[in-house]
A protein has these predicted regions:
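Structural marker of alpha-solenoid helical repeat scaffolds
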Residues: 16, 50, 67, 84-88
Length: 112
C-alpha cells in the first residue's frame, strides 16, 4: 500500500479513537517515507509516550528528528532507544542506533 493510502487509513483510525503505539508508529513511518519528517516526529513522539519500551519507535523518531534538522532531538531519541533495546535484549536495534548516535555525535560535538 502506498504511503498516502496508509496515512489516510491510519488517520481515519486515529479519528475514530483507535489511538495506540503501533498505530502512531505506522503513521510516523508513513509520513517519514513521504518526506514529511515534522509530521513523523509528532506521531513517533506519541508512539514513544504510549510505549516507551518500543525500541523501533525510538529508532524511527531519531531518524525523523535528524531529517527535520533537529540533531539534538535525534541524539536524545537514539539514547532512549538504546536503553529500550537493551532492556528488551534487542541487540540488533541497539547496534543500529549506536552507529547512528555515534555519527550524529561526531557531527555535533558537545551533545553529551
Amino acid at each position: 500500500m502506498e504511503p498516502a493510502a496508509l496515512i489516510e487509513n491510519f488517520e481515519k483510525m486515529l479519528a475514530a479513537g483507535k489511538d495506540n503505539a503501533l498505530l502512531r508508529f505506522g503513521l510516523g513511518n508513513a509520513y517519514l517515507s513521504r518526506g514529511q519528517p515534522e509530521k513523523a516526529v509528532e506521531h513517533l513522539t506519541r508512539a514513544t509516550e504510549l510505549d516507551p519500551g518500543h525500541s523501533a519507535s525510538w529508532k524511527q523518531l531519531g531518524k525523523a528528528q535528524a531529517q527535520a534538522g533537529r540533531n539534538d532531538g535525534a541524539i536524545g531519541a537514539y539514547r532512549r532507544g538504546i536503553e529500550a533495546a537493551r532492556a528488551k535484549g534487542d541487540k540488533q536495534a541497539e547496534k543500529e542506533m549506536t552507529v547512528f548516535l555515534k555519527r550524529l555525535e561526531k557531527q555535533n560535538p558537545g551533545q553529551d
